Amino acid sequence: MLNPSIDSLLKKIDSKYTLVTVAAKRAREMQLADDCAVEKPVSHKFVGKALEEIDAELLNYVPSEEKVSE
């Protein structure tokens, strides 16, 4: 079982694609600075820590207003 669960994460961020993108960007930041906002993370990997931050509502995103032309 994954912790945090995908269901609880999708309540915070509505799209799986956006969830992965936000978590990957935050994981990259943590690799460079080694700063995690979660007090005692369960995961030892950066992506897992980023997902825990999203689940704890310590990390969120603001959607872009820019629309991609088709």
From Swiss-Prot:
Domain of life: Bacteria
GO biological process, one term: DNA-templated transcription
Entry GO CC: DNA-directed RNA polymerase complex
Primary enzyme class: transferase
Catalytic activity: RNA(n) + a ribonucleoside 5'-triphosphate = RNA(n+1) + diphosphate
E.C. no: 2.7.7.6
Single annotated GO MF: DNA binding
SUPFAM superfamilies referenced in this protein's UniProt entry, alphabetically: RPB6/omega subunit-like
Signal peptide: none
Swiss-Prot/TrEMBL keywords: DNA-directed RNA polymerase, Nucleotidyltransferase, Transcription, Transferase
NCBIfam families reported for this sequence: rpoZ
Recorded family membership: Belongs to the RNA polymerase subunit omega family.
Subunit organization: The RNAP catalytic core consists of 2 alpha, 1 beta, 1 beta' and 1 omega subunit. When a sigma factor is associated with the core the holoenzyme is formed, which can initiate transcription.
Role of this protein: Promotes RNA polymerase assembly. Latches the N- and C-terminal regions of the beta' subunit thereby facilitating its interaction with the beta and alpha subunits.
Protein's UniProt name: DNA-directed RNA polymerase subunit omega
Organism encoding this protein: Bacillus cytotoxicus (strain DSM 22905 / CIP 110041 / 391-98 / NVH 391-98)
Lineage: Bacteria, Bacillati, Bacillota, Bacilli, Bacillales
